[in-house]
Curated annotation (Swiss-Prot):
The lineage of its organism: Bacteria, Pseudomonadati, Pseudomonadota, Gammaproteobacteria, Pseudomonadales. This is tRNA/tmRNA (uracil-C(5))-methyltransferase. Dual-specificity methyltransferase that catalyzes the formation of 5-methyluridine at position 54 (m5U54) in all tRNAs, and that of position 341 (m5U341) in tmRNA (transfer-mRNA). CDD domains: AdoMet_MTases. The active site is at 317 (nucleophile), 351 (proton acceptor). The gene is trmA.
Length: 359
């Protein structure tokens, strides 16, 4: 793969044009464009292992051909830390039967702050020989090691990495757990957080956040408002978010483990939820809602829920479903800010953001 700057610029412009065309029916302003480094931008990577020539190699598969492996010696789109670790880990498993026996998959997770974790997946139980070798590996490479085997997990070091991102002149620390979703492009994620921080602005009242994950947006946005009510359904992400709130001394956020659909029912007083025990929703004075939904976008009921807010800050990983949701809201809200974030260079995927304000 060649990392030609002119080709990247052309692909970036194609994405901007696509977003502009999708939002044209809604009189959207010209999008701000946030580009990506051309290489070493991806903070996580996953490889299968493939035996050839008497040894195991890192391998990936094309979406068009799941049978023929593409052997990988280096992975230029991945972070420099991952590229440093790849040959070191390969040398370690080649030298150790305890590490290599029935090893079939390797996952790397790194951060801009320099932290790293490696997950090793096996088709066998992990014994004391593995633990001895894995402990030495963790020390030699200065990483945490996770061993996975048939639903069991062994942790050497931590089961998370720590990221540090600067937003609005403040550095936030994020605990990112193994197996949980994190934004893969740290540089663009930081740009995205700063755009959302600026777009929301200082508010005298409260913010509702749906799909908060590990608190990626929650931490900086909480500094812009009086109080935040944030929702997330994943237990792993909820625990990480609570830890991140505590680590950063952010004390104005209440986090509840509800889906967006369940919260809609709670706000509409359709039925009570035990997970909301002790939380009086009527004490919140919401004027703004922040949403970062999955690729399917917001379901119609959640979309209708957001309509009751004066300001809708929306981050999307799928511009088609973003446009569909805006079409549902266009009669009451207009786009006042728009942005495109190139989270996924060299692919057709993009991240985008809009601020919708009541007409």
């Amino acid at each position: 793969m060649t990392f030609d700057a002119a080709r990247y610029t052309a692909q970036l412009q194609d994405k901007v044009t696509r977003l502009r065309d999708l939002l044209a029916p809604f009189d959207a302003p010209e999008p701000q464009v946030f580009d990506s480094p051309l290489q070493n931008f991806r903070l996580r990577a996953e490889f299968r292992l493939w035996r050839e020539g008497g040894e195991r190699h890192y391998a990936m598969f094309s979406q068009d051909d799941k049978r023929t492996p593409i052997l990988i010696e280096e992975f230029p789109i991945a972070s420099q830390r991952i590229n440093q670790l790849m040959p070191q880990l390969k040398a370690a498993w080649q030298a150790s039967a305890a590490l290599s026996h029935k090893l079939f998959q390797v996952e790397f997770l790194t951060t801009l702050a320099g932290d790293a974790m490696i997950t090793l997946c096996y088709h066998r139980p992990l014994d004391e020989h593995w633990h001895t070798a894995a402990n030495k590996l963790a020390t030699d490479l200065n990483v945490s090691i996770i061993g996975r085997s048939k639903g069991k997990r062994d942790v050497i070091g931590h089961d998370y990495v720590v990221e540090k991102l600067e937003v609005g002149g403040r550095t936030f620390s994020y605990r990112q757990p193994e197996g949980a979703f994190t934004q893969p492009n740290g540089t663009v994620n930081q740009k995205m957080l700063n755009w959302a921080y600026d777009a929301l602005g200082d508010r005298p009242d409260d913010l509702l956040e749906l799909y908060c994950g590990n608190g990626n947006f929650t931490l900086p946005l909480a500094t812009r408002v009086r109080k935040v009510l944030a929702t997330e359904i994943s237990k792993t992400s909820v625990n990480a978010a609570l830890s991140n709130l505590d680590e950063n001394a952010v004390g104005n956020v209440t986090l509840v483990r509800l889906s967006a659909e369940e919260l809609t029912e709670a706000l509409n007083e359709v039925r009570p939820f035990r997970r909301l025990h002790g939380i009086d929703l009527k004490r919140y004075e919401f004027s703004s809602v922040f949403v970062d939904p999955p690729r399917a976008g917001m379901d119609p009921d959640t979309c209708e829920l957001t309509r009751r807010f004066d300001n809708i800050l929306y981050i999307s990983c799928n511009p088609e479903t973003l446009a569909a949701n805006i079409a549902q809201l266009h009669d009451t809200h207009r786009i006042t800010k728009c942005a495109m974030f190139d989270q996924f260079p060299w692919t057709h995927h993009m991240e985008s953001g809009v601020l919708l304000t009541r007409r």
